[in-house]
A protein has these predicted regions:
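Outer-membrane beta-barrel pore domains
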Residues: 277-511
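Outer-membrane beta-barrel translocator domains and adjoining extracellular loop/strand segments
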Residues: 38-44, 88-96, 109, 139-146, ...
Length: 511
């Protein structure tokens, strides 16, 4: 992996010498403070996993070049890093010498390479390699609660990705039907984080795991007032090694060997692998969502959207046997950035059904006389042999289901995925230089089917953000945030932050 990044960095340096215009660059100072070890929910969510702790003082710099979509062949690259101070937080770990669990202070790295990538495109097809922040392909990442499968909630994973640059016309449809799709394979670089935060008492830990992502969407002609987008996206974890602990003792080590065939089996999930469980279940850990967006454009260019995401962990969810589970939303986009309310999103989220409470497969219990099958207990983001769907403690999907960074007991699985609630996001301008964003949510959790809460936990989260653009210095802005959480799910957290940013363009490589 180190050789991979060395080669990628060499390519980036070489590319700068021949760069098309423009080259974007950014520098910012981020300072946050609060009453808790972790930042309030909205300050840490959908932010690339950069700010997770309550107190931070970070300096972040980056440079990037986007595709020139007017050319058949173009390329893109970027580098982004930050360094500074973040406070520590205690997580429980079993001490074999003392025979008990003890708190161990953990904190983010002092310096982080957030993004490093290079991309090429020819016509409508692209190839990308490296770490790049990626947002939801369909939903509003700025105002929404987060995509169920791919959001910008966690730090990016090193990967190779290929697909269509944007939606492409399907031949012989005269532009009335378009297609967009992507396929990616990568490898997690979170082994150190897992080993530092795991309790080593009970349960298991996965290291050396591979990552897969894929999606395919179809869209009707976007130039029409009414347009529909429908499709599916899926993500998976496979390979690596699972170590199982019981009462502080390592009882089992399961290596999941990865062969070339396993990559193909992740593209089209099927059973029959050589590893334990794969002979009866789909290869690795697979999850995904059915996605639908209906958009209507008014005569004044205002757009109204209604959308849903139907989550699934296996065939029962794909067949929509999980009731009303999903993300159900409405979006308003005035296309007038200076309006008092230029955009708004309202979402109702429910993940309580999960195809029922019971999972029973005859192959799991060969000595039983029961021949029936129950395909429930889907337990979103959890898997019977893989840790939660996350990277460095943060969910790769929606943060509305609390990430394992909240698990002070060092448990590597989601503890609250049976929950429901709402989310509201609004943005606009009070007057020309000052933009605002307001986020509000409420949720109620019953835990999981395997770990039911005796009493449901509730939570209310709020954030108000203002961004002031200095007219005197183009590209200079100051962002202020104030946020809180209230309730038993995430705790009572209060905090605020200031970010001073400067964005610029370099045209020295232009023709």
């Amino acid at each position: 992996m180190n050789k991979f990044f060395s080669l990628l960095l060499t390519l980036l340096v070489s590319a700068v010498a021949f760069a098309e215009t423009p080259l974007n660059y950014k520098g910012e100072f981020v300072g946050t403070a609060g009453n808790s070890d972790l930042a309030p929910y909205y300050m840490m969510s959908n932010n690339g996993g950069v700010v997770t702790q309550g107190k931070n003082a970070l300096l972040r710099v980056g440079a990037w070049k986007d595709f020139d979509l007017s050319k058949r062949f173009s390329y893109s690259f970027g580098v982004d890093a930050y360094a500074g101070y973040s406070n520590s937080k205690d997580y429980l770990r079993y001490n074999i010498e003392q025979g008990k669990v003890l708190p161990m202070a953990q904190k983010p790295a002092a310096a982080v390479l957030q993004q490093l990538y290079a991309e090429v495109k020819f016509r409508g097809v692209f190839l990308s390699a490296g770490m790049k922040e990626r947002k939801s392909p369909l939903l509003n990442s700025y105002l929404g609660s987060g995509d169920f499968v791919q959001s910008n909630n966690a730090r990016p994973i090193p990967q190779v990705r290929a697909g269509f640059v944007d939606f492409q016309n399907i031949p012989f449809t005269n532009g009335w039907v378009q297609i967009q799709g992507e396929l990616a394979f990568g490898k997690y670089m979170q082994d150190g984080w897992l080993e530092d935060h795991y309790n080593y008492l009970n349960g298991f830990i996965n290291t050396g795991v591979w990552y897969n992502y894929k999606r395919c969407y179809f869209r009707t002609k976007p130039s029409q007032p009414f347009s529909v987008t429908v499709g599916m996206q899926m993500a998976g974890q496979f390979g690596g090694t699972r170590k199982f602990y019981v009462n502080g003792e390592l009882t089992e080590v399961e290596p999941y060997d990865v062969k070339l065939k396993d990559f193909w089996d992740m593209i089209i999930p099927k059973s029959g692998g050589n590893n334990f469980g794969d002979t009866q279940y789909f290869n690795g850990n697979t999850l995904g969502s059915w996605d639908f967006v209906a958009r209507y454009r008014l005569k004044n260019e205002t757009e109204l959207k209604a959308y849903f995401q139907w989550p699934f962990e296996d065939g029962s969810g794909i067949g929509k046997m999980n009731g009303f589970d999903g993300v159900w939303g409405f979006e308003y986009d005035s296309k007038k950035p200076d309006a008092i309310v230029s955009g708004a999103v309202f979402e109702y989220l429910q993940f309580t059904n999960q195809s029922g409470p019971t999972h029973w497969a005859p192959n799991d219990n060969p000595d039983s006389s029961m021949e029936g099958e129950a395909t429930g207990g889907d337990s979103y983001y959890n898997n019977f042999r893989y840790n939660s769907y996350m990277n460095l403690g943060m969910s790769q999907g929606t943060p509305f289901i609390p990430s394992i960074i909240y698990n002070e007991d060092g448990y590597m699985r989601v503890l609250d995925n049976r929950l429901k609630g709402f989310h509201l996001g609004i943005t606009g301008k009070i007057y020309a230089p000052l933009r605002y964003r307001m986020l509000l949510s409420y949720r109620k959790s019953w835990g999981t089917y395997s770990n039911i809460r005796i009493e449901p936990a509730k939570n209310t989260s709020f954030m108000l953000e203002g961004i002031y653009d200095f007219k005197q210095v183009k590209g200079l802005s100051l962002k202020g945030q104030i946020a809180f959480d209230k309730g038993g799910l995430l705790g009572d957290n209060f905090g605020g932050g200031l970010t001073l940013s400067y964005n610029g363009l370099l045209n020295i490589f232009g023709k």
